[in-house]
Amino acid sequence: MRKLPRPFYERDTILVAKELLGKYLVHHDGLEEKIGRIVEVEAYLGQHDLACHSSKGLTKRTKVMFGPAGYAYVYLIYGMYYCMNVVTEKEGIGSAVLIRALEPIKNIQDRTQGPGLLSKAMRIDSKLNHRDLLSNDFYIAEPNSPTDFTIIEKPRIGVHYAKEWANELLRFYIKDNPYISKT
């Protein structure tokens, strides 16, 4: 496996989102190394995207989204689930890609269909917020033998409040993969 370099993340968010599909999310938490293949993501395009956390501006919570690229943005939802995002583009944009689902590859026994479930299975929590994804214990890597697949584009899940942004085709997943989240 080859860790993704910083310039990978510094590009257009939609391009990064699509190219994250098939990559490996790796977390070594001191107990064991867990690896999951990214099979579903959502793109959040910065301050003009009403579904994006950064649309409310720079806050203590969203500061990491404004850069630099290649850092993890991890936050708690419903008081019980962590969601993991990858910060993208140049500093100041406030864009990120939400990792929605993983296919278990190594040391994952729990369900990974959905952002909260995958974070629980991978032991991702608030301690990993603002973590550099070029670190040695938490990163995304190119698999040794990439596979071909078809990418499906759909509207993001759970963003009905975002007006015209609710129907944008910014959710991407690997066609026919059994590990995508349920809608």
Curated annotation (Swiss-Prot):
UniProt enzyme class: hydrolase
SUPFAM superfamilies assigned: FMT C-terminal domain-like (SSF50486)
Family from the record: Belongs to the DNA glycosylase MPG family.
Q: Is the DNA repair keyword given for this protein?
A: yes
Keyword Phosphoprotein among UniProt keywords = no
GO MF annotation terms? alkylbase DNA N-glycosylase activity; DNA binding
EC assignment: 3.2.2.-
Tell me the HAMAP family matching this sequence: 3MGH
Question: What protein name does the entry list?
Answer: Putative 3-methyladenine DNA glycosylase
Keywords, comma-separated and alphabetical:
DNA damage, DNA repair, Hydrolase
**A GO BP entry:** base-excision repair
